[in-house]
Amino acid sequence: MSEKGRLFTSESVTEGHPDKICDAISDSVLDALLAADPRSRVAVETLVTTGQVHVVGEVTTSAKEAFADITNTVRARILEIGYDSSDKGFDGATCGVNIGIGAQSPDIAQGVDTAHEARVEGAADPLDSQGAGDQGLMFGYAINATPELMPLPIALAHRLSRRLTEVRKNGVLPYLRPDGKTQVTIAYEDNVPVQLDTVVISTQHAADIDLEKTLDPDIREKVLNTVLDDLAHETLDASTVRVLVNPTGKFVLGGPMGDAGLTGRKIIVDTYGGWARHGGGAFSGKDPSKVDRSAAYAMRWVAKNVVAAGLAERVEVQVAYAIGKAAPVGLFVETFGTETEDPVKIEKAIGEVFDLRPGAIIRDLNLLRPIYAPTAAYGHFGRTDVELPWEQLDKVDDLKRAI
């Protein structure tokens, strides 16, 4: 333990980070297919490297025009991120785009289309007919540390990353380039955030920028101070924060020219910044029949409503599935001693209020829509800039009644 207290760190990255370019492409392809055919089955993985994009995976869809237009969808998203010139290391208009997509395996499709409950047990409920697209375990988490009920380190790291992109795109700091990362270290006493210890901001920039005279003061004033003023956290002292701006020095070579990128390689950034556990499954490029995505969203929905209902100050919930089965094989609730009701009662109430069969999750959260591209950067949970169905607090009263 540090003399400053217990130090916890989370990181975020901007939409121009190579891995996030891949997440954005995968989710843009998903959205394009869902917009034309909401029943599309999509599992799309992307790789980017110098001058090249490779999009592979499995898709079953009736959206023939959207499928044929995937190359243009890829290029449009890269350009929207800001890679529009070889001077920035990547150009969506001229990069090579290779598509290698096949159909979903019929062996997987049979378990999703006709779940074990319907196929073997003769269940008549339509929601018993859609099985989980894979086995796996998914976690959801919520904590009353911020208005969005997220851990403070990841919430602050995401705000800094979003602000980096804002000042680049709106011309406040036009010399910034799309690639960037942020990291936040916060000191805790008795699980209360008391001091902002260290902030690291690394951002790609134009070659002719003086780091000490221009970049460092601009980032402090236009990015960090703006975010901290907006945050205005009650218990967090930011007066002595150590700020490290581009601690390696210049950062001109970035994006896919600096590092290759892959879909699904920022799963901790996507979720809770390491503060809560993770089941291991990535989100981007997957349609909601994949419980890696839809069930993780559902568990965030569960956790957030439990905390908002005042049943616990923080809660972590786990659900698990067997491939081809509709009903979860496991549900686990951890309240870390912060509960205001018996944890057994909380778990029972969750089971009564939330239907965690994949078909029910898709129905209740209305997931067969093109809503996924905005989630590809800056986190899937606790977003303050976009409205997402799994962030709604619509089950608070139901949980209170069930208790």
UniProtKB/Swiss-Prot annotation:
Query: GO terms for molecular function, please?
Result: ATP binding; magnesium ion binding; methionine adenosyltransferase activity
Q: Where does Mg(2+) bind?
A: 19
Pfam families tied to this protein: S-AdoMet_synt_C (PF02773), S-AdoMet_synt_M (PF02772), S-AdoMet_synt_N (PF00438)
Where is the protein localized?
Answer: Cytoplasm
Which residues does the annotation say bind ATP? 17, 179-181, 250-251, 259, 265-266, 282, 286
The family database entries (InterPro entries) matched by this protein are listed as: ADOMET_SYNTHASE_CS, S-AdoMet_synt_C, S-AdoMet_synt_central, S-AdoMet_synt_N, S-AdoMet_synthetase, S-AdoMet_synthetase_sfam
- Record note on cofactor: Binds 2 divalent ions per subunit.
State the pathway, as annotated in the record: Amino-acid biosynthesis; S-adenosyl-L-methionine biosynthesis; S-adenosyl-L-methionine from L-methionine: step 1/1
Which SUPFAM superfamilies does UniProt cross-reference here? S-adenosylmethionine synthetase
* Residues annotated for L-methionine binding in this entry: 58, 104, 259, 290
The terms describing its cellular component in GO are: cytoplasm
Q: What is the protein's major site of localization?
A: cytoplasm
**What highest taxon heads this organism's lineage?**
Bacteria
> Which parts of the sequence bind K(+)?
45
Among PANTHER family, the record links this protein to: S-ADENOSYLMETHIONINE SYNTHETASE (PTHR11964)
**Subunit structure of this entry?**
Homotetramer; dimer of dimers.
Give the similarity note.
Belongs to the AdoMet synthase family.
Q: What is this protein identified as?
A: S-adenosylmethionine synthase
Give the species.
Mycobacterium bovis (strain BCG / Pasteur 1173P2)
